[in-house]
Amino acid sequence: MDDNNYQILSQLRENVISKMRIFVDKNNERFFSDNELLQLSDIEVSFLSRNSISRHGLTTNLDKSKKLSPSNCKVKLNKKLFEEKYFLYAEFVLFHEYIHCLGNFSHDKNFRQLENLWPEKKQMNIIGRQLTRELQEIKAQWAWTCSKCGFVVKRSSRKFRSNYFHKECLGKLKNIPIIRPTSLEH
């Protein structure tokens, strides 16, 4: 990892941990102890090797025979998160992954309660959907096009059945390849 990427990831880690430090319950008790935050700061954070469409972050258990914990995991983030317009969302994604690192493997009620501590959580969900749509647009190689109303759904895979219909107008869908201009055609 080059110095610039290291600095970006370090800054992101610092931002998230400093926010986690101030999360308190109604009795003014902190949700995350200094020890937990110190352990989180030692977790390796890097980039996903392939930019997935729907995966914005990933926590992996290093030793599958042991329980997920800060000393037994690493976090990978989608590179697209580091565009300026997504940087605040990147903080939320790292926070989400850190909750996993603290042993909260499933997205259960307890996990969601911790996740809801994040400021502007609803806005983060909107930004997350926006990022997913943008990634879908980039990766799309096929367009399902309605023969009746012209509605288009872009898809990354060719998987298609000839009996697909648009649910709004019941027009038959056609699977059309998306042809992008090459760099020589610009």
Residue ranges and their predicted role:
Residues 6-84, 88, 105-186:
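Metalloprotease/metallohydrolase-associated module, dominated by Zn2+-dependent proteases
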